[in-house]
Amino acid sequence: MINKLIFSITVLFALTAQAQSTDIARVEYMRIPFSNSDNSVGRFRALLQVPIPLDKELNKILVAGFEYRNVNVDIKDAVPAGFNIQDVSSLHRISAYAGYVWKFKENWRFGVKAGVRINSNLAGSLVADDWIYTASVYAINDMKDASTTKPYRWIFGLDYSTTPGRNFPLPLINYYREFHPNWTYTLGVPKTNVRHYLNGNHKDALQAFVTLDNFFANIQNNMSIDGRSAENISMTIILGGLGYEHFFTKHLLYYAYATHSISNDFRLRNNDRDDIYTINSDNTFYFRTGVKFKF
């Protein structure tokens, strides 16, 4: 029963634009000390998801989820006239969503999810541009517990959000494979990795990975820079690095990642996705650590 509940939560959160997450609960902290700059970014994140079974067999399950992120932006480099540093020093993302997962046939499940989130500096009362709406559909072929020598899982889906400048759904695909008793790999976006367990009981693991991270927030008091209006602040960063995981139980673990960016774009934009001012673009180190309960 517990495994079915965990699996249903997993598939509902697995297909978001932000992560291929299999988390049920997570608390983490991230820090970026920008290279060739005195600027830095820190982020706190907390996540919780709750299953609501609709039948005894657990073939139909509702899932409710909540996530909060706070991004602290410390800008010490010189900035152009009109750039109000205080307006972007603290950014918030508050997400709530609900989904429905049902079993189609053995080893196959389908799901839908809809949500709303606030992405804003929250300088005042909420405005229309602070709100973003999301929707996802997906199919899961899960063979992790099947009688196969190399367990695997496929996830296919489409994800749509009303993020400014993105008026089309994104296709999503994820493939997980256990190819040796102590080795697994995942292919997909935003994360591709190879994991090696350091001991037979799978208590400790190292992984090498490439991943994508980002954040976005509406600026309630738009800034005028060189005669152009900056309406939001965002960052997109592609990373490659190493991670360590310690499993307290099969599903509860501590993790720490040390990476370096391959591509980095931290900027102010308007709602047509035109760059107004680039804050940092040099490749840099990136650190993230936390505790999570996962499927």
Language model regions located:
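Membrane-embedded beta-strand positions of outer-membrane beta-barrel proteins
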Residues: 25-27, 62-66, 112-114, 154-158, ...
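Outer-membrane beta-barrel translocator/channel fold
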Residues: 66-94, 190-274, 280, 284-287
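Outer-membrane beta-barrel "beta-signal"
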Residues: 174-176, 281-295
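Short sequence motifs at beta-strands and strand-loop junctions characteristic
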Residues: 38-42, 86-92, 127-131, 148, ...
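Transmembrane beta-strands of outer-membrane beta-barrel pores
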Residues: 29-35, 66-74, 116-122, 141, ...
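Outer-membrane beta-barrel strand-turn architecture
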Residues: 52-58, 102-106, 143-148, 179, ...
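Transmembrane beta-barrel domains of bacterial outer-membrane proteins
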Residues: 20-126, 132-138, 178
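Repeated loop/turn-to-beta-strand initiation elements of outer-membrane beta-barrel proteins
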Residues: 56-62, 107-110, 144-154, 182-185, ...
